[in-house]
Amino acid sequence: PLLNFSLERSPLPGQMHPGLNLGNKVLDIFIHLARLAKKDGLLAFPAYFHNALLFSRAFHFFNPKKQGEILAIRKSLFHIPFKQMAWIVHLNCLKDKEGRIYEWKAEEMVFSINKALRKYFGSRAYKEKVKKTQERLKFDIDWICYKKRIEKEGLEKLP
C-alpha cells in the first residue's frame, strides 16, 4: 500500500495502489480451502469489467448470456491492450452496434468444483446460449468520448 503508480504502472479503474501480483496464488488458496470444506464452487461478483476479464481465466458467468457478452467484447476489442479496454468500458466509451453505450453490470461468476457445476458449464445448452449471444453482439469504441474522458479524469498518461 505504500507504492504509488508510475508511467510504467498506471492504475486500473477503482485501484488506489499498485497490485502485488498475487491474484493467482490467492485463487489457488481459495480453491484449496473450498475443496477442504467440500464446497460446490467459488462465487465472484466482479464489481469492475476488468475483474470479470481477470476472473474469466478460471470462472464462468452463471448466466450464459453474460458469458457471451464478455466474449463478444473481447472479440470486438482483441487489438486493444487490457488496461485500455478496462478504462474504455469504465468511462462508458464502448458502444454496441446500434450505437448504445455499453454499461458494465456485474453478475455472479462461478468456479466449479463439483461435477454438477462442471456439467452445467460444459452443457450444450449453456455453450449454445453463450455462442448465440457472442455472435449477436458487436462493439465499437467511441474514441472521441475516450479522449475527452481521460483528459477530464486526469488520466492522459493512459494508452
Predicted regions and their residues:
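Acyl-donor binding region in acyl/amide transferases
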Residues: P1-H60, K65-S76
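Intrinsically disordered, low-complexity, charge-dense segments enriched in Lys/Arg
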Residues: I70-P159
